[in-house]
Amino acid sequence: MKRNTPFSKSCLALIILFGILPAFGSAAGVQANQQTAPALKEIQVPVIHVKGSHYEAGYQIGTQLKKNFLQEVGEMKEDPNWKKIRAEAELYLAYSRKYLPEYVAEAQGTADAVGLGLEDLFPTLCEELWDENYRFTKGCSDLIASNDVTADGSVLAAHNNDTSPSTQELVTIIHYQVDGEPEIVTVGYGGLGISVGYNSAGISLTGNQVDSTDMRVGVPRLLLVRKILAARTIGQAIDAAILKERASDYNQVITDRNGEIYSIEGSATDYAPLYSTEGYLVHTNHYLAPWMRKFEFDPQGITSSIVRYNRGVRLLKNNRGRITVDLLKQFLSDHVNYPGSICRHGNYVKTTFSVIINLTTGTMLLARGNPCEVKYNEYKLISRKEN
């Protein structure tokens, strides 16, 4: 079985969990390491608005992003193993119909709008089947700060998303107003796969790709992401992240506007619910919980993740009580261990978008590209906050 697939979500979720991690003894007020750069560029990101039933929302996504879907499926069909991948994806589809039928309805709506069969479109949601060199394979960094450690009492979720440079032009915001769900704002790469998001109930999802040894046939992890973002409580979000019938999992970083922060380190058959006891959390692309380390697919290939994680912990720990949106922008632009830094650079993989979600105000800052080079634009898409 191949590994990783389109819209995959490996990310540096710099998760800081004291009680699991050793303390870092460094002077307070550690500053981000930034290289001198020219004036920041202004880059706009397209916003897609969808509403109605799940099928209708999917149909609207397909209508507005038809070109992207046709290109993505066309590229998949060029794979010499396409027939095998398509057949295996039908097994994942059967699980999804049984356990998350509402999101299969969304995918069906998209397929109908684009003029594809669902069996041809659904493999774009089954990253478990794809090679690790696929361009949407990711590495990411998360730095989360609760109201206990920010300067103004805001709850802030910061995230860098690292993929192939060729995906940067595809970065798209989708604003969902789906019947029976909270309003949801997501960022992804112009398809059904979601990298990060938040909702009107005050739940955000960021996180990181972790590659485990126990992938299996089941509900694709990209559908877990969609279900998490429909949650109205952090408990519901965690339940969605650990669906028993999952094919694999990410490290799901789930935060609520009360300042509760969990990192759900998952594989197909196990998970570790890591909780932030110090008011902040960092995670990247490797397992932290001792009992999850046996699932690490490539223990020799996580050096960048280890460095990014420890760097993120140090930056947040030593700035407790002073953390602001502007300071997080600096942290997300950090170049320690360049090019494999929090702000990642390179021809194979780079930071293709950077986001800071303010769960207190219900707003999002997004920069398409490296945050050391591109301005953040603010988006206020949530029309109402739920209690």
Language-model segments: what does each one mean?
Residues 6-8, 24, 51:
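Intrinsically disordered, low-complexity segments
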Residues 2-13:
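Bacterial N-terminal signal peptides that target proteins for export
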Residues 88-89, 217-224, 293:
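Flexible glycine/proline-enriched surface loops and loop-helix/loop-strand junctions
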Residues 28-139, 229-387:
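C-terminus-biased signal that marks the final domain/tail of proteins
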Residues 127-222, 239, 352-356, 364-366, ...:
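Internal mixed beta-strand/loop scaffold within catalytic domains of large alpha/beta enzymes
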Residues 11-23:
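Bacterial N-terminal signal peptides
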